[in-house]
Amino acid sequence: MAAFALVLVGAGNPAPSLSAYIGKYPSDKVAGISLYNNPKFRILVSGAAPNMSIRTTVLTNGVETPVERQGALLVARVCEPHNCNGHQWTVAILLPNGPAAICYHDGDLMDGDARWFIGGTSIGRSQGCWEGNHTDVPDAVITRLARGH
């Protein structure tokens, strides 16, 4: 019954479009909802993540950069506090409605490489998900997103 009531309350206040977060930090609220809690973002991350552990990590606050627009993509970059070089992730979403790709790097588990995932499947490797201020999403990832996977 509580879930039903929650759906009705949510139906009265639609979540903001993902593009409303561009220029804001992922934890900043737009219409009372952070990017991490935006239902569309959560669904797209769930569809891209290869497992529950990575999905949970990506949907958790960390050290953030402002959400950017890269061409037709919304790009959010986050890392683990005090371990940004060792544990970082990026979410790239083809606006307005997806699909999404996730870059994930855990230096303790991945031998220095980062992996890009779409639809739960690894589609490529890179040196890292982000270095310093900005790293563009690789062209191969953008092409896969544009094709719908």
Regions found by a protein language model. Name each.
Residues V75-P81, Y104:
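Short beta-strand segments that buttress and anchor functional surface loops
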Residues L73-L74, G98-A100:
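Hydrophobic residues embedded in beta-strands of well-ordered beta-sheets
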Residues G12-L74:
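N-terminal secretory signal peptides
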Residues N83-T90:
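Short, surface-exposed coil-to-beta transition loops
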Residues A92-L95, H105:
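Solvent-exposed alpha-helical segments and adjacent loops
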Residues A15-V30, L35, P39, D108-H149:
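C-terminal partner/receptor-binding element of secreted or periplasmic proteins
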Residues A101-D108:
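Catalytic Cys-His active-site segments of thiol-dependent hydrolases/isopeptidases
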Residues M1-V7:
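Bacterial N-terminal signal peptides
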